[in-house]
Curated annotation (Swiss-Prot):
The gene is rplS. Keywords: Ribonucleoprotein, Ribosomal protein. The lineage of its organism: Bacteria, Bacillati, Actinomycetota, Actinomycetes, Micrococcales. Belongs to the bacterial ribosomal protein bL19 family. It comes from Renibacterium salmoninarum (strain ATCC 33209 / DSM 20767 / JCM 11484 / NBRC 15589 / NCIMB 2235). This protein is located at the 30S-50S ribosomal subunit interface and may play a role in the structure and function of the aminoacyl-tRNA binding site. InterPro entries: Ribosomal_bL19, Ribosomal_bL19_CS, Ribosomal_bL19_sf, Translation_prot_SH3-like_sf. This is Large ribosomal subunit protein bL19.
Amino acid sequence: MHILDSLDAASLRSDVPEFRAGDNLKVHVNIIEGNRSRVQVFQGFVLGRQGDGVRETFTVRKVSFGVGVERTFPVHSPIIEKIEVVTRGDVRRAKLYYMRDLRGKAAKIKEKRDNAPTKK
């Protein structure tokens, strides 16, 4: 089993920012079309994270033209160029599956406020 653990450790990415459910993310995904490749940005909020290590995934949800779109990404996948945290969400759950049924203002997530001291 130690050999598998060392292979898993070699596949882990080090540039993954800290994020959790409720955070608004921009996921830059490498899309390959024929012989061309381009970067597509998928921006939405995190419904939840699952798994651990190399097998860890996260689900991002956004509403595009009135239709909810969810996409699940492996955290350590090579097709992800980078992950940007846009805002931090103030939620009390690890999985936000109930957000699928909410519409309008009810589907808004409060932004987490920083408790950093202000400079005078």
